[in-house]
Amino acid sequence: MLVQGFYTHRPYFKEILKNTTGNILECGCGEGSTMMIREHIRGTDRILVSLESNLEWLSKYTHLADANHVLQHVIADNEDCVKTGNKWVEHIEANQLTNFEVVFLDSSPWMSRKCCFDYFLDKAKVIIIHDFDYFPNNNIIGKTILRTCVDNKEKIECDLTGVVKNYKLFYPPYKHFVGTTGPPTLVCSNIMDHEEFDTLVRIIQTNEASYYV
C-alpha cells in the first residue's frame, strides 16, 4: 500500500508523475514525497528540485543530491505571514528556478504554500497542494461552501472560482483518514484546458483505489 500515515497525497501525485514528463519542484522535503519522486524519475532526464527552510530537516536528504536531484535551503523562518512566504518566492526567483511542469506544495509555514501557489499559478502546468482544506477554511485560497461529517471525519467542498481555472479536491477513503480531516489534496491547473484537466482527473480516479490494496 502506497498510502501510509499522512502521505495521503501520494495516489494523486503518483498518477500525475506517470502522466507528465517535465521537471518537478517540491516545496517541503518529506518521506512521503521526496523518495517517491526520486524513484519515479530514476533513469529519465527529469529534474527534481527540492526546497526546504528547516536546515536540520533538509540535512536528512542532502546526501540524495545527484544529476537529477537538486536540494536547496530557503533562508526563511517559520512565522506564518506573507513576508515569510515571499522569502520562498525570492529564493525561487534569485535561483532562477523555472520550467517546472509539476509543483508540489507541502512546505511550512502555511503562507509559504500560498505565496508559491500564487507565483506558479500561470507558470506550472499542474500544482498540487497537500492539506489544502486549511486554505479555504481560513479564506486564504477560495472559500469553503460545504462541510460533511461522517463518524467525526470531515470533508469539505470549496469554491475556487476566480482563483484557478481547473481544480479538484481529493480525499482518501474514510477508513484511511489520518485524524479528522483526511487530509485532502488539491490538484489544480491554470494552464491546462478543461478537457485535458478532466482527463487527468479521470485517470487519477480510475487508479486511486489500487493505492490502498
In which residue ranges do the predicted regions lie?
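A short alpha-helical cap/connector motif
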Residues: 1-104, 108-128, 132-213
